[in-house]
Amino acid sequence: MRIYAANSVFIKVTRRCNMCCAHCLRGDAESIDIQEKYIDAFLDSFEMGAYISSLTFTGGEISLNIPAIRYTLKAVKERGIAVGSFYMVTNGKAVDKMADLAMASLEWWNYCDDKDDYSCGLCISSDDFHEAIPYESKSILSGLKYNRNDKVTDFHRACLLNEGRAKNLDSDIYKKREPHVDKLEYEFSKTGGIDFYSGELYLNAIGDVVSGCDLSYESQKKYCLGNAMDEK
Protein backbone atom coordinates (compact mmCIF):
# COMPACT_ATOMS: atom_id res chain seq x y z
CA MET A 1 0.00 0.00 0.00
CA ARG A 2 1.59 3.26 -1.14
CA ILE A 3 0.87 6.98 -1.00
CA TYR A 4 -0.64 8.42 -4.16
CA ALA A 5 -1.13 11.97 -2.86
CA ALA A 6 0.02 14.12 0.06
CA ASN A 7 -1.05 17.67 0.78
CA SER A 8 1.93 18.82 2.85
CA VAL A 9 5.36 17.15 3.03
CA PHE A 10 8.37 18.42 4.98
CA ILE A 11 11.96 17.17 4.66
CA LYS A 12 14.60 18.19 7.18
CA VAL A 13 17.90 18.28 5.32
CA THR A 14 20.09 18.94 8.37
CA ARG A 15 20.14 19.49 12.12
CA ARG A 16 23.24 21.65 11.78
CA CYS A 17 22.89 25.40 12.22
CA ASN A 18 25.27 28.36 12.06
CA MET A 19 23.25 30.38 14.58
CA CYS A 20 22.30 29.70 18.19
CA CYS A 21 19.01 31.54 18.68
CA ALA A 22 17.52 31.61 22.17
CA HIS A 23 14.01 30.94 20.85
CA CYS A 24 14.82 27.96 18.61
CA LEU A 25 11.99 25.46 18.85
CA ARG A 26 14.27 22.61 17.72
CA GLY A 27 16.66 22.81 20.68
CA ASP A 28 20.43 22.55 20.39
CA ALA A 29 21.86 21.96 16.93
CA GLU A 30 23.27 18.53 16.13
CA SER A 31 25.92 17.52 13.59
CA ILE A 32 23.50 15.42 11.52
CA ASP A 33 22.68 15.67 7.83
CA ILE A 34 19.93 13.58 6.29
CA GLN A 35 21.27 10.56 4.41
CA GLU A 36 20.23 9.91 0.83
CA LYS A 37 18.97 6.45 1.78
CA TYR A 38 16.31 8.06 4.01
CA ILE A 39 15.10 10.26 1.16
CA ASP A 40 14.97 7.27 -1.17
CA ALA A 41 13.16 5.03 1.31
CA PHE A 42 10.63 7.75 2.13
CA LEU A 43 9.87 8.48 -1.51
CA ASP A 44 9.66 4.76 -2.25
CA SER A 45 6.52 4.77 -0.09
CA PHE A 46 4.86 6.87 -2.82
CA GLU A 47 3.33 5.41 -5.96
CA MET A 48 4.97 6.13 -9.30
CA GLY A 49 3.30 9.28 -10.56
CA ALA A 50 2.11 10.35 -7.10
CA TYR A 51 1.41 14.01 -6.28
CA ILE A 52 2.75 16.20 -3.46
CA SER A 53 0.89 19.51 -3.22
CA SER A 54 3.52 21.33 -1.13
CA LEU A 55 7.09 20.29 -0.30
CA THR A 56 9.02 22.24 2.35
CA PHE A 57 12.73 21.92 3.14
CA THR A 58 13.65 22.64 6.75
CA GLY A 59 16.65 22.66 9.09
CA GLY A 60 18.72 23.45 11.04
CA GLU A 61 19.97 25.78 8.35
CA ILE A 62 19.12 24.48 4.89
CA SER A 63 22.04 26.20 3.15
CA LEU A 64 24.41 23.87 5.03
CA ASN A 65 23.12 20.87 3.05
CA ILE A 66 22.12 22.06 -0.42
CA PRO A 67 23.13 18.69 -1.96
CA ALA A 68 20.19 17.05 -0.14
CA ILE A 69 17.79 19.58 -1.68
CA ARG A 70 19.10 18.71 -5.13
CA TYR A 71 19.11 14.99 -4.41
CA THR A 72 15.43 15.14 -3.45
CA LEU A 73 14.65 16.75 -6.81
CA LYS A 74 16.54 13.98 -8.60
CA ALA A 75 14.69 11.36 -6.55
CA VAL A 76 11.18 12.70 -7.26
CA LYS A 77 11.98 12.94 -10.97
CA GLU A 78 13.12 9.33 -11.04
CA ARG A 79 9.83 8.24 -9.47
CA GLY A 80 7.64 10.50 -11.58
CA ILE A 81 6.33 12.23 -8.45
CA ALA A 82 4.75 15.57 -9.32
CA VAL A 83 5.14 18.50 -6.92
CA GLY A 84 2.85 21.51 -6.81
CA SER A 85 5.12 23.94 -4.98
CA PHE A 86 8.19 24.17 -2.76
CA TYR A 87 9.03 26.34 0.24
CA MET A 88 12.44 27.05 1.77
CA VAL A 89 13.59 29.29 4.62
CA THR A 90 17.21 30.29 5.24
CA ASN A 91 18.76 32.52 7.90
CA GLY A 92 20.99 34.05 5.21
CA LYS A 93 24.15 33.95 7.31
CA ALA A 94 26.23 31.81 4.92
CA VAL A 95 26.66 34.43 2.20
CA ASP A 96 28.97 32.13 0.25
CA LYS A 97 26.15 29.58 -0.12
CA MET A 98 23.32 31.90 -1.14
CA ALA A 99 23.99 31.82 -4.88
CA ASP A 100 24.02 28.01 -4.87
CA LEU A 101 20.84 27.93 -2.79
CA ALA A 102 19.21 30.32 -5.25
CA MET A 103 20.21 28.03 -8.14
CA ALA A 104 18.87 24.94 -6.34
CA SER A 105 15.59 26.74 -5.72
CA LEU A 106 15.36 27.68 -9.41
CA GLU A 107 15.81 24.02 -10.33
CA TRP A 108 12.88 23.23 -8.07
CA TRP A 109 10.81 26.10 -9.44
CA ASN A 110 11.33 24.80 -12.96
CA TYR A 111 10.02 21.38 -11.88
CA CYS A 112 7.00 22.45 -9.82
CA ASP A 113 3.53 22.79 -11.30
CA ASP A 114 2.34 25.92 -9.48
CA LYS A 115 4.62 28.59 -10.92
CA ASP A 116 2.20 31.45 -11.35
CA ASP A 117 0.23 31.72 -8.12
CA TYR A 118 3.12 32.56 -5.76
CA SER A 119 2.83 29.22 -3.99
CA CYS A 120 6.61 28.66 -4.16
CA GLY A 121 8.84 30.54 -1.76
CA LEU A 122 12.46 31.08 -0.70
CA CYS A 123 12.57 33.38 2.32
CA ILE A 124 15.12 34.78 4.74
CA SER A 125 13.92 34.52 8.33
CA SER A 126 14.21 37.61 10.48
CA ASP A 127 13.09 38.24 14.05
CA ASP A 128 14.14 39.54 17.46
CA PHE A 129 16.56 36.66 18.05
CA HIS A 130 18.34 36.15 14.72
CA GLU A 131 21.64 37.78 13.88
CA ALA A 132 21.54 40.62 11.38
CA ILE A 133 21.00 39.44 7.82
CA PRO A 134 23.97 40.24 5.54
CA TYR A 135 23.07 42.68 2.78
CA GLU A 136 24.76 40.40 0.25
CA SER A 137 22.37 37.56 1.04
CA LYS A 138 19.33 39.78 0.64
CA SER A 139 20.71 41.07 -2.65
CA ILE A 140 21.40 37.60 -4.08
CA LEU A 141 17.90 36.30 -3.34
CA SER A 142 15.96 39.50 -4.06
CA GLY A 143 15.79 38.91 -7.80
CA LEU A 144 13.90 35.65 -7.47
CA LYS A 145 10.22 35.88 -8.38
CA TYR A 146 9.31 33.78 -5.35
CA ASN A 147 11.52 35.57 -2.80
CA ARG A 148 9.16 36.68 -0.04
CA ASN A 149 9.38 38.36 3.36
CA ASP A 150 6.70 36.30 5.10
CA LYS A 151 9.18 35.00 7.69
CA VAL A 152 9.75 38.40 9.30
CA THR A 153 8.36 38.02 12.82
CA ASP A 154 8.00 40.37 15.80
CA PHE A 155 7.96 38.09 18.82
CA HIS A 156 6.93 40.94 21.09
CA ARG A 157 3.57 40.54 19.35
CA ALA A 158 3.58 37.00 18.01
CA CYS A 159 3.68 33.93 20.23
CA LEU A 160 6.73 31.73 20.58
CA LEU A 161 6.29 27.99 20.33
CA ASN A 162 7.12 26.66 23.78
CA GLU A 163 9.53 24.03 22.46
CA GLY A 164 13.30 23.57 22.49
CA ARG A 165 15.29 26.57 23.76
CA ALA A 166 12.17 28.73 23.93
CA LYS A 167 11.17 26.89 27.11
CA ASN A 168 14.01 28.72 28.88
CA LEU A 169 12.75 32.20 27.96
CA ASP A 170 10.83 34.29 30.48
CA SER A 171 7.09 33.86 29.94
CA ASP A 172 6.49 37.27 31.52
CA ILE A 173 8.36 38.88 28.63
CA TYR A 174 7.43 36.65 25.72
CA LYS A 175 4.04 35.19 24.95
CA LYS A 176 4.18 31.47 24.35
CA ARG A 177 1.88 28.77 23.08
CA GLU A 178 2.13 25.02 23.12
CA PRO A 179 2.64 23.27 19.77
CA HIS A 180 -0.45 21.96 18.05
CA VAL A 181 -0.15 18.97 15.75
CA ASP A 182 -2.91 18.66 13.19
CA LYS A 183 -4.20 15.15 12.79
CA LEU A 184 -2.99 13.38 9.67
CA GLU A 185 -6.19 12.69 7.77
CA TYR A 186 -6.29 10.29 4.87
CA GLU A 187 -8.52 8.29 2.60
CA PHE A 188 -8.00 5.34 0.30
CA SER A 189 -8.34 5.36 -3.47
CA LYS A 190 -10.22 2.65 -5.34
CA THR A 191 -6.86 1.03 -6.08
CA GLY A 192 -5.84 1.09 -2.41
CA GLY A 193 -3.46 4.05 -2.51
CA ILE A 194 -3.40 6.52 0.37
CA ASP A 195 -4.23 10.23 0.05
CA PHE A 196 -2.97 12.30 3.01
CA TYR A 197 -5.29 15.21 2.32
CA SER A 198 -4.75 17.03 5.63
CA GLY A 199 -1.93 17.38 8.14
CA GLU A 200 1.86 17.43 7.80
CA LEU A 201 3.98 14.44 6.80
CA TYR A 202 7.51 15.15 8.00
CA LEU A 203 10.73 13.25 7.23
CA ASN A 204 13.37 14.27 9.75
CA ALA A 205 17.15 14.07 9.46
CA ILE A 206 17.44 10.66 11.14
CA GLY A 207 14.87 9.05 8.86
CA ASP A 208 11.89 9.19 11.21
CA VAL A 209 8.52 10.00 9.69
CA VAL A 210 6.69 12.37 12.03
CA SER A 211 3.17 13.77 12.16
CA GLY A 212 3.76 17.53 12.36
CA CYS A 213 6.76 19.75 11.70
CA ASP A 214 6.90 22.42 14.43
CA LEU A 215 8.39 20.23 17.14
CA SER A 216 11.67 20.04 19.03
CA TYR A 217 14.01 17.16 18.30
CA GLU A 218 12.91 15.67 21.60
CA SER A 219 9.17 16.02 20.93
CA GLN A 220 9.49 14.49 17.48
CA LYS A 221 9.97 11.13 19.18
CA LYS A 222 6.45 11.41 20.62
CA TYR A 223 4.82 11.96 17.24
CA CYS A 224 6.99 9.51 15.27
CA LEU A 225 5.00 7.20 12.99
CA GLY A 226 8.00 5.00 12.22
CA ASN A 227 11.27 5.16 10.32
CA ALA A 228 11.60 5.39 6.56
CA MET A 229 13.88 2.35 6.67
CA ASP A 230 11.28 0.17 8.40
CA GLU A 231 10.21 -2.86 6.40
CA LYS A 232 7.18 -1.99 4.31
Predicted feature residues:
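Acidic (Asp/Glu)-rich catalytic clusters
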Residues: S45-G49, K77-G80, M103-D117, S142-L144
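Non-cysteine beta-strand/loop elements that form the S-adenosyl-L-methionine
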Residues: D114-H130
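Hydrophobic/aromatic residues located in beta-strands of well-ordered beta-sheets
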Residues: L55, F86-M88, L122, D150-T153
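Hydrophobic "anchor" residues
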Residues: D208-V209
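Short, small/polar residue-rich loop motifs at catalytic or cofactor-binding pockets
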Residues: G193-Y197
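Conserved alpha-helical substructure of the radical SAM core
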Residues: M1-M88, V95-D100
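Active-site beta-loop-alpha junctions enriched in small/polar residues
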Residues: G60-I62, N91-K93, D127-F129, R157-G164
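C-terminal accessory region of radical SAM enzymes
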Residues: N149-D182, D214-K232
